[in-house]
Design a protein with these regions (language model features):
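C-terminal region of N-terminal signal peptides and the immediate post-cleavage residues
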Residues: 21-37
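Short, well-ordered beta-strand elements
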Residues: 34-48, 65-70, 163-169
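Ligand-binding cleft/hinge of the Venus flytrap
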Residues: 55-62, 156-193
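Short helix-initiation/N-cap motifs at beta->coil->alpha
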Residues: 68-80, 192-204
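Alpha-to-beta junction loops
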Residues: 83-92, 163-166, 182, 206-216
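Ligand-binding "clamshell"
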Residues: 101-111, 115-130, 208-210, 222-238
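A conserved helix-loop-strand patch within extracytoplasmic ligand-binding domains
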Residues: 111-167, 252, 271-275
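Periplasmic-binding protein-like
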Residues: 126-127, 133-140, 219-267
C-alpha cells in the first residue's frame, strides 16, 4: 500500500471513529423525552393569564413538556378547545362548569358541593377536575360609590330604584342565568339596558359614566381603591367560583406513570392560591404593571414550586 493510500485509510478511520464518538456523546448527553406535550390554555383576562402561567411554569419545573396558549376566549370557547383536544389543561371556575357548561338549575348549597358536582358532570365526558383553590372569584355588580349613596344601593335588586340604569359587561354575560338574564329573571331588572364591553374596558366605562353599573370579578384589584361599591347578591345568582384545573383524560392516559405527578403538581399550586395571594398577584399585574409571567415565577419560587 502506498503512503498516500495508507494516509487516506487512516484519515477515514479517524473520521469514522470521531463521528461515532460524537454520536455517543450526543446521545448520552441528551435530555430524556418529557412525553406528550401538556397544552395549557387560559381565558382572556388578567387573573386567567396569571393562572395559566402558574400552571405552565410549575409543570415545566416538574419536567413536563409544556405549551401555553394564552387568551383563548370565554368559557364556551375554551371549553370547546379542551373537548376538541386543542388544549388539554386549563384553570376553570367551578360555577362556570356547573352553570355555563352544564346549565344546572338545581345547585348545591356549599362550595364543596359545587366542586363535587363539577367533578361528577365532567367525568362523563372524559375530563378530570382536580382540587379547587382556597380563593374564589365570583361575578358581582359594582357601582360608583357616589351613586350607591345617592340611591341607597345595597343589593342587586336595589338597582330597580335607578331610572334608565344600564349595565356594562362582556358579551357572553348577557344571556347567562348567572349573569344579566339572572338579574332580570331573579331580581326583576327587566327594564335595564345592556351595554356589551370588552372585559378590560368596564371600569373605564363606569368611571366615564357611560354605564351606571358594571359586571366585575370579586378579586379585581380595582375594588380596593374605595371608588366603588359591590352590591350584595342574596339570591346567589352568581354562584360559587373557586378555581380548579380541568385535565383531559386522554392526556392522563398518554402520560402513563407521570399522570400522578401532573395531578400533584397542579394540586400543590392550587393549595397555595388564597384570596390574599391572588389579589396580590392581580394587583402586581394591573397596578404595578408587572407581567403575568414574572408574577407567576416569583410566586412559584417563593413557595418552593419552581
Amino acid at each position: 500500500m502506498s503512503r498516500k493510500k495508507w494516509r487516506s485509510v487512516v484519515i477515514v478511520g479517524l473520521l469514522a471513529s470521531l463521528t461515532s464518538a460524537l454520536m455517543l456523546a450526543t446521545t448520552a448527553g441528551a435530555a430524556p423525552k418529557a412525553g406528550p406535550t401538556v397544552i395549557v390554555g387560559s381565558k382572556n383576562f388578567t387573573e386567567e393569564y396569571i393562572l395559566g402561567e402558574l400552571y405552565s411554569q410549575a409543570l415545566k419545573a416538574a419536567g413536563f413538556s409544556v405549551q401555553y396558549k394564552q387568551s383563548i376566549g370565554a368559557t364556551e370557547v375554551i371549553d370547546s378547545a379542551l373537548t376538541s383536544g386543542k388544549i388539554n389543561v386549563y384553570p376553570e371556575y367551578v360555577g362556570e362548569i356547573d352553570q355555563t357548561v352544564f346549565h344546572q338549575k338545581t345547585l348545591p348549597q356549599t362550595a364543596k358541593g359545587w366542586w363535587q358536582l363539577a367533578v361528577k358532570l365532567n367525568k362523563k365526558r372524559g375530563i378530570t377536575v382536580l382540587n379547587p383553590t382556597p380563593f374564589f372569584d365570583v361575578d358581582a355588580i359594582a357601582v360608583r360609590k357616589a351613586d350607591a349613596t345617592k340611591y341607597g344601593l345595597h343589593t342587586v335588586a336595589d338597582l330597580k330604584k335607578v331610572p334608565n340604569a344600564s349595565v356594562g359587561a362582556r358579551p357572553e354575560f348577557k344571556d347567562r342565568e348567572e349573569g344579566f338574564k339572572g338579574m332580570q329573571d331573579v331580581y326583576g331588572l327587566t327594564g335595564m339596558k345592556y351595554v356589551s364591553l370588552d372585559q378590560g374596558l368596564t371600569y373605564q366605562a363606569l368611571d366615564q359614566k357611560k354605564v351606571f353599573c358594571i359586571d366585575v370579578f370579586s378579586t379585581d384589584p380595582q375594588l380596593a381603591s374605595g371608588k366603588y361599591v359591590v352590591l350584595k347578591d342574596p339570591k346567589l345568582i352568581f354562584g360559587v367560583q373557586n378555581v380548579a384545573p380541568e385535565v383531559s383524560n386522554k392526556l392522563l392516559t398518554a402520560l402513563g406513570s407521570k399522570a400522578a405527578l401532573l395531578k400533584s403538581t397542579l394540586n400543590k399550586v392550587d393549595a397555595k392560591l388564597t384570596q390574599k395571594a391572588i389579589l396580590a398577584m392581580n394587583s402586581a399585574v394591573v397596578n404595578n404593571k408587572q407581567t403575568p409571567k414574572a408574577v407567576a415565577s416569583a410566586f412559584l419560587k417563593a413557595n418552593g414550586l419552581a
